[in-house]
Amino acid sequence: MTESFTRRERLRLRRDFLTIFKEGESLQNEYFVVLFKKNGLDYSRLGIVVKRKFGKATRRNKLKRWVREIFRKSKGVIPKGFDIVVIPRKKLSEEFEQVDFWAVHEKLLNLLKRIEG
């Protein structure tokens, strides 16, 4: 299995996001809300939604890079065949400057492992 994050593994279309928001199931912890829905494919796709309230663009982009990296490196433990949308919560925004990559990694990976169809 390759560790790249290919174009086909990205959620890009508005209708895909809307379908997940409407019909998807959710999991959450203090840092993230994860929405997911079966996609009928043999691989999972990732979408990230970060509101402007989270902070300035550099901060939002840093979080998105972290989430993509966690997804990319953890493909082996994330169930296949799901569309996944990750949304950060307010607590992560408030603590973002004090939190390191590995704390975010642990919190997000715990949620992603719980995805089941």
From Swiss-Prot:
InterPro entries annotated for this entry?
Answer: Ribosomal_Su5_D2-typ_SF (IPR020568), Ribsml_uS5_D2-typ_fold_subgr (IPR014721), RNase_P (IPR000100), RNase_P_CS (IPR020539)
Q: Which UniProt keywords apply?
A: Endonuclease, Hydrolase, Nuclease, RNA-binding, tRNA processing
Catalytic activity field: Endonucleolytic cleavage of RNA, removing 5'-extranucleotides from tRNA precursor
Molecular-function GO term, any one: 3'-tRNA processing endoribonuclease activity
Is-annotated flag, keyword RNA-binding?
Answer: yes
Q: Give the Enzyme Commission number.
A: 3.1.26.5
Give the signal peptide range. Answer: none
GO cellular component terms, alphabetically, are:
ribonuclease P complex
Q: What enzyme class is recorded for this protein? A: hydrolase
GO biological process, any? tRNA 5'-leader removal
* SUPFAM superfamilies in alphabetical order: Ribosomal protein S5 domain 2-like
The text of the family note is: Belongs to the RnpA family.
**Assembly information from the UniProt record:** Consists of a catalytic RNA component (M1 or rnpB) and a protein subunit.
Q: Which PANTHER family match?
A: RIBONUCLEASE P PROTEIN COMPONENT
Q: What does this protein do?
A: RNaseP catalyzes the removal of the 5'-leader sequence from pre-tRNA to produce the mature 5'-terminus. It can also cleave other RNA substrates such as 4.5S RNA. The protein component plays an auxiliary but essential role in vivo by binding to the 5'-leader sequence and broadening the substrate specificity of the ribozyme.
Q: Which NCBIfam families match?
A: rnpA
Q: What is this protein called?
A: Ribonuclease P protein component
Please name the source species: Thermotoga petrophila (strain ATCC BAA-488 / DSM 13995 / JCM 10881 / RKU-1)
